Regions:
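Short glycine/proline- and aromatic-enriched beta-strand/turn motifs that initiate or cap beta-hairpins
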Residues: 21-84
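Outer-envelope beta-barrel architecture signal
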Residues: 28-34, 61, 70-74, 103-107, ...
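Outer-membrane beta-barrel transmembrane domain signature
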Residues: 42-44, 173-252, 263-264
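Outer-membrane pore/translocation modules
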Residues: 93-194, 260
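Outer-membrane beta-barrel translocator domains and adjoining extracellular loop/strand segments
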Residues: 44-52, 87-91, 119-124, 151-153, ...
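Outer-membrane beta-barrel "beta-signal"
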Residues: 136-143, 277-289
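Transmembrane beta-strands of outer-membrane beta-barrel pores
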Residues: 38-46, 69-73, 78-84, 102, ...
Length: 289
């Protein structure tokens, strides 16, 4: 208990010290980094008039490896063979992410394929052949980038020395594909592809403590406008993304824990709303070479 109080006291003193100090953002001398991550990923899909309330991935644990050089980063993740239900087929998950950070900007690209979900019926799991495919290309600009660095909290290639925050503005193109091969979600019995354009915005704030400990809180949101290529009808796609990152950013190595929730609504009509909920917990280690 005494150690806990001492730890909180030193964090508070470090926070007050860094607010007053006003130190700039440091760029590590070592430009190349290796990245190792463990991802606990929970994707839930809910569809109107389906045979399930919601379904989820059967393999929620991924491992990842990646790297970074200069302003460019990439990560590859693969699902480990641990299942929620051993009687059902394992989920198939593939995800590739890349990030690029020119001054004050963040460009993000991703491709993800998620096959085979399960849902619960009277404490038993049932397999469903739902497939979700998505690709995203987004850009976000930080209005206050002299003292605030998004990448310092999430990519760990900068060291932010002062508590600061910034408004974020940008946009995104998203291609979302949904298919229920076994017709458990009848509306998606035929594959539906939705190209989506969305303005994006939010706010992010990083609290800096002593010894390069940090805490970042971020809230992003967007209102997307999509087109269902199968029915030629417009789809309203609002999305909210709260994020939290906590970690330590040293000169040769760094680590963080990131919690993120991504909630997407698909408004096909006033009475027809489906949803995709993606919650993840990531532990990232970065070694600068």
């Amino acid at each position: 208990m005494i150690r806990c109080k001492y730890f909180l006291f030193t964090l508070l003193c470090g926070l007050l010290f860094n607010i007053a100090l006003g130190a700039p953002i440091e760029v590590p001398e070592k430009k190349f980094s290796l990245r190792f991550s463990t991802l606990f990923n929970f994707i839930n899909f809910s569809a109107k008039d389906s045979y399930f309330d919601n379904c989820q991935l059967n393999q929620p644990i991924d491992i990842g490896i990646g790297g970074g050089i200069g302003d460019f980063f990439w990560d590859f993740t693969y699902a480990l063979p641990f299942s929620i239900d051993d009687k059902s087929s394992p989920s198939e998950v593939f995800e590739l992410n890349t990030n690029f950070y020119p001054k004050g900007l963040w460009f993000h690209g991703m491709v993800g394929v998620y096959n085979r979900f399960v849902f619960s019926v009277e404490k038993e799991y049932v397999e469903t052949k739902v497939q979700i495919f998505e690709t995203r290309i987004s850009g976000i600009y930080s209005l206050e980038n002299e003292y605030f660095s998004w990448r310092a909290a999430y990519e760990l290639d900068r060291i932010q020395k002062k508590t600061a925050g910034s408004w974020l503005v940008g946009g995104e193109f998203r291609l979302l594909g949904l298919h229920s091969k076994d017709q458990m979600a009848p509306y998606y019995a035929k594959r539906r592809m939705l190209p989506i354009l969305a303005p994006k915005g939010g706010y992010s704030h990083t609290f800096i403590f002593s010894n390069d400990w940090f805490l970042n809180l971020t809230l992003l949101g967007e209102i997307g406008f999509g087109l269902d290529l199968l029915s030629d009808k417009f789809v309203l796609v609002p999305e909210s993304i709260p994020k939290l990152a906590f970690g330590k950013n040293g000169k040769s190595w760094a680590w963080n824990m990131v919690i993120q929730c991504d909630y997407t609504l698909l408004g096909h009509s006033i009475k027809h709303w489906d949803s995709i909920y993606d919650a993840s917990f990531v532990v990232l280690f970065v070694w600068r070479i």
